[in-house]
């Protein structure tokens, strides 16, 4: 297997060749992955917002954004600037500390979760042995922020919206975790790198989506509910309880909720690609293709091509899933709160438990195919 390109080693060696001490070179490298991660996630959100507006406009036979830049590509930037310069209003009877902390608790864990998303063999900020467990743990913090925002607003509609959001997130967190546990059982690891490696070698035929068809459906439904996407956007739907926990928010605090929702959608799509679609792996194994062409897997230019294709494949898979999520917005009607909770507790939870037990049985019966 191609070991991948070592960006950290190449960067530090380049700085050492320029005369910098090794310690200084490492200090310069340390913040760069985090900065790239924040910039990449922000740009990804801007692209998703623009795509959703254009796709939604096409579904309604409209033009969509077209004046802010060519084809309206700068419309999300204009929206962000508008929110930045709006007045930040705090209700007179609200708790100012909790009111401010709520949006931060919603957004910050999502950005931190990008630490474990791999775009290649060595293209990951932190390859933890419990990477997927860390993602699930961080996603469990968001309901606290939502409930805090609803409570701190001192508004009955905000409080009810916050309670609904917390109940929805908790209801779908358990089926999500159980579907991920089935993947971890097959991969014998919670590391995102190991999960992708377990799917490599056979191209598209080795992806987990074929061995976990029920698990991938559970994961995708639960991920949409976690991101509060239609048809699961009850906590913030205008037709429901005013605007939910966001009712009293304005300016950049409201913008944090807006950004957090889309950043979480992109993150969920990337994690889905890692768990079920082979991550950065190409549908045809590149190592086998290089062997057929007589190219050495250790050649530098092949490593660069492999890394570039890996990043491209991850983004293509993620944005295809986001495209599906946007289409669902204009296809599936919004469910009622009782239907939403029944789906999570009475259907997805027992099905995810059965799927986990079935995966364990298949692993014992067919260890080669199911990672015994």
UniProtKB/Swiss-Prot annotation:
It is a multi-pass membrane protein. NCBIfam families: PRK06076.1-2, PRK06076.1-5. It comes from Gloeothece citriformis (strain PCC 7424) (Cyanothece sp. (strain PCC 7424)). The chain crosses the membrane at residues 31-51, 97-117, 130-150, 176-196, 204-224, 254-274, 308-328, 347-367. Keywords: Membrane, NAD, NADP, Plastoquinone, Quinone, Thylakoid, Translocase, Transmembrane, Transmembrane helix. InterPro entries: NADH_UbQ_OxRdtase_su1/FPO (IPR001694), NADH_UbQ_OxRdtase_su1_CS (IPR018086). This is NAD(P)H-quinone oxidoreductase subunit 1. Belongs to the complex I subunit 1 family. The gene is ndhA.
């Amino acid at each position: 297997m191609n070991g991948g390109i070592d960006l950290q080693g190449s960067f530090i060696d380049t700085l050492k060749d320029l005369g910098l001490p090794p310690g200084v070179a490492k200090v310069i490298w340390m913040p760069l992955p985090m900065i790239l991660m924040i910039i990449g996630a922000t740009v990804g959100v801007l692209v998703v917002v623009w795509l959703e507006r254009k796709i939604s406009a096409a579904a309604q036979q409209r033009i969509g954004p077209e004046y802010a830049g060519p084809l309206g590509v700068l419309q999300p930037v204009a929206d962000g600037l508008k929110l930045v310069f709006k007045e930040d209003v705090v209700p007179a009877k609200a708790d100012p500390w909790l009111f401010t902390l709520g949006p931060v608790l919603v957004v910050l864990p999502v950005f931190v979760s990008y630490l474990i998303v791999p775009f290649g063999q060595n293209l990951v900020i932190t390859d933890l042995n419990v990477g997927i467990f860390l993602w699930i743990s961080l996603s469990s913090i968001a309901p606290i922020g939502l409930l805090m925002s609803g409570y701190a607003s001192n508004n009955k509609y905000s409080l009810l919206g916050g309670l609904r959001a917390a109940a929805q997130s908790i209801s779908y967190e358990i089926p999500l975790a159980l579907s991920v546990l089935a993947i971890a059982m097959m991969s014998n690891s919670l590391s995102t790198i190991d999960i992708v490696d377990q799917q490599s070698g056979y191209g598209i035929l080795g992806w987990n989506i074929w061995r976990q068809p029920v698990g991938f459906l559970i994961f995708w439904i639960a991920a949409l509910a976690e991101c509060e996407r239609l048809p699961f956007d009850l906590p913030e739907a205008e037709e429901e309880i005013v605007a939910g926990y966001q009712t009293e928010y304005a300016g950049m605090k409201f913008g944090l909720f807006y950004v957090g929702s889309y950043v979480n959608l992109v993150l969920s799509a990337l994690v889905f690609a890692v768990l079920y679609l082979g991550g950065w792996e190409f549908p045809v194994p590149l190592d086998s293709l290089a062997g057929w062409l007589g190219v050495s897997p250790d050649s530098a230019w092949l490593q660069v091509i492999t890394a570039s294709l890996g990043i491209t494949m991850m983004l293509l898979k993620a944005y295809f899933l986001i495209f599906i999520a946007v289409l669902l917005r204009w296809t599936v009607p919004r469910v009622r709160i009782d239907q939403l909770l029944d789906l999570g507790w009475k259907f997805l939870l027992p099905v995810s438990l059965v799927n986990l037990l079935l995966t364990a049985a298949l692993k014992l019966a067919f260890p080669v195919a199911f990672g015994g």
